[in-house]
A protein has these predicted regions:
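An acidic/histidine-cluster motif and surrounding catalytic segment
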Residues: 1-122, 130-167
Length: 167
């Protein structure tokens, strides 16, 4: 008689709990592991209490980011991150969105601040995730709350807080 199958230890994912992260790397400024960035996203979302999400991260250079910035926000020139909330409030729930990140900007700003470019890039991604979760940074009080939450999520992802007084 065969032994019954062993049950795995620890919490098991529910059928409705899934974090899908896709990383599309269209830049040459930094070498970024898609697996590492996916782990950053999953850990940050877990800390945020998100159990379902479909997130696409687009890594681009400054030229492509400038085109996206102009096309979607009407603002000329590159920026660090643009978030596209794609959630339609349908029955699946969870977060759905695309986050475009300029790796060139991350490299440049990291050099100015004296920390690792991949950490700056991860900071941009976490910032985008918080926008998808409903955070905003248009007024000082909201900005302070968002910055504090960014630090919490970066820590949850195993990353240091961003240096500098701007954060």
């Amino acid at each position: 008689m065969a032994a019954p199958p062993r049950r795995p230890r620890g919490p098991q994912p529910r059928d409705d709990a899934a974090i899908d992260v896709q990383v599309l790397d269209r830049q040459r400024a930094l070498t970024i592991s898609a697996a590492w960035l996916g782990r950053v996203v999953r850990r940050a979302l877990a800390r945020q209490g998100v159990t379902r999400a479909e997130i696409a991260i687009l890594l681009v250079g400054d030229r492509r980011m400038a085109r996206l910035h102009e096309q979607w926000l009407g603002i000329p020139g590159p920026t660090d991150v643009i978030t596209f909330d794609l959630a339609d409030g349908g029955p699946r729930g969870g977060l759905q969105g695309d986050i475009a990140v300029s790796a060139e900007t991350a490299r440049r700003v990291a050099r100015e601040l004296g920390w690792q470019p991949r950490h700056e890039l991860a900071y941009y991604v976490v910032h985008g995730l918080l926008h998808l979760a409903g955070y905003d940074d248009h007024d000082p009080a909201d900005r302070r709350a968002m910055r504090a939450r960014e630090r919490v999520l970066l820590r949850a992802a195993g990353l240091p807080p961003p240096p500098g007084s701007r954060r």
